[in-house]
Amino acid sequence: MEEGAKIGREHEQQQQQHGRVNGSGRVAAVGGGSGGGGDEIEIEVAAAAGASPSRQHGGLHGDVQAPTWKRFLAHVGPGFVISIAYLDPSNLQTDLVAGSSHRYSLLWVLLFGFIFVLTVQSLAANLGIITGRHLAELCMGEYPKYVKYCLWLLAELGVIAATIPGVLGTALAYNMLLHIPFWAGVLACGACTFLILGLQGYGARKMEFTISVLMLVMATCFFMELGKVNPPAGGVIEGLFIPRPKGDYSTSDAVAMFGSLVVPHNLFLHSSLVLTRKMPYTSKGRKDASTFFLLENALALFIALLVNVAIVSISGTICANNLSFADTSTCSSLTLNSTYVLLKNILGKSSSTVYGVALLVSGQSCMVATSYAGQYIMQGFSGMRKCIIYLVAPCFTLLPSLIICSIGGTLRVHRIINIAAIVLSFVLPFALIPLIKFSSSCTNIGPYKNATSIIRIAWILSLVIIGINIYFFCTSFVAWLVHSDLPRVVNAIISSLVFPFMAAYIAALIYLAFRKVNLSDPFPTNSVSGEIEVQHIQIQEKQEDLGVHL
């Protein structure tokens, strides 16, 4: 017994010397016993995994030996939650306009855009896998006080802007299907979102499963519509693989479509969701996890791409036919609301009902996903406990969106969605640049740094998107200023405020791009997102190890 107690004390000293908690709530310990050999192992303690500590400990080695398809299925979920952002009412409206104005000639923009999205999202997923922290936590630990709080404010602003189209789309769908007032639809949308977010108490997988089902329902609805319209397969395939912009404003519309594909909250969300999975704390374990998450994300994005192609093809086929004067006028300025009327006039009431269901699912799933991202963003930047975040974050993101949409009403839906898109494009660089900086930092992720070619492609395409967004913002503002009916004095005052603001905006981006990453510990010592029974598991490990030696 004395020998056993001595071994136990030695093991406890090793735990105190080497044990630490990484950013995803995992206990990392350097084994120094007979079977340790200096290998690092990771014990999953994330609450969302839904397993007891003893089961999680036992699964470290058993999961690696499981069949490949089982390990892949264990990683399915985050990609589908991420893909919802590319099926929200804002993208739906953009696709409808692109199809009605240019038929199938801009489909290639979607294809290349989704390839870029897959690249960027894989960087976000790998960042979480390698560092054990999500993007918000890394920003909080890396940047000076005022910089990180500005990043937090901008990230929350992006979540609110991404939530607004979801609220509008859901409220419109309720009005189409149930003929209830717009404001009542807004309230119903908020209530349903709170209810679905309550599934977090049963684990992250339940939330991911719910959002995945909503995504598949939406895909089914639009594929049903596509079957009724029956677009020419040759024209769709040609538009998908051969860049041939046709018609007025085709170039600007293509640029706008590409620039709106990457959304900032997805970068925070993806780096967070990967931390809800059990992963062995080894080089092979990380490599396998990265591969599985990449394949899962590619599958989900492929489904999202098909749905977007279907939406463009539906509006492109309908508006290319011989229509009445009223329907032709509707096609010239297609919106979420007018599409319902157009489908009802041409394909019948059943078709418009299917569209209404798809819009409802699109808006509601968008609301849930963005609110979910807001929770991780607030947790990472504030350090508050999850139980508080679950209550505060949805109110912080949902209430402003609900108020804005209630005031705007149905007549301003198109304008509000456009303003929300501008805000998202404004916020995007402040999430995208830190992500690429962390992903390419040798001090932050060391030997697991992404390939140089991937980083270069990400930088080039990111600079293109940032340049597009800045260009459109400046040109839109100048056009508004030229055609404004305001007095010259007021225009001069507005200009004196906006242009210095844009100069400060560009200076902030340059600061983020050229600032050296100083965060050198790839396995953090403290992370609120994983404060789940860490001490209990450490004690349990000591007891189990002591029992083995005895």
UniProtKB/Swiss-Prot annotation:
Its family?
Belongs to the NRAMP (TC 2.A.55) family.
Coiled-coil residue windows: none
Keywords, alphabetical:
Ion transport, Iron, Iron transport, Membrane, Transmembrane, Transmembrane helix, Transport
Q: GO: which molecular function terms?
A: cadmium ion transmembrane transporter activity; manganese ion transmembrane transporter activity
Q: Which organism encodes this protein?
A: Oryza sativa subsp. japonica (Rice)
Keyword Acetylation among record annotations: no
A Gene Ontology annotation in the biological process aspect, one of them, is: iron ion transmembrane transport
Q: For the region Disordered, what residue ranges are annotated? A: 1-37
Q: Topologically, how does it sit relative to the membrane?
A: Multi-pass membrane protein
Regions that span the bilayer:
72-92, 105-125, 151-171, 177-197, 207-227, 255-275, 292-312, 354-374, 388-408, 416-436, 457-477, 492-512
Q: Where is the composition biased (Basic and acidic residues)?
A: 1-13
Name of the protein = Metal transporter Nramp4
InterPro entries attached here? NRAMP_fam (IPR001046)
According to the lineage, what is the superkingdom? Eukaryota
Per the UniProt record, one Pfam family is Nramp
GO cellular-component terms in the record? plasma membrane
Q: Give the UniProt subcellular location, in the record's own words.
A: Membrane
Residue ranges with Low complexity bias:
14-29
Asked if Flavoprotein is a keyword of the record, the answer is no
| Gene name linked to the record | NRAMP4
**Its biological purpose:** Probable metal transporter.
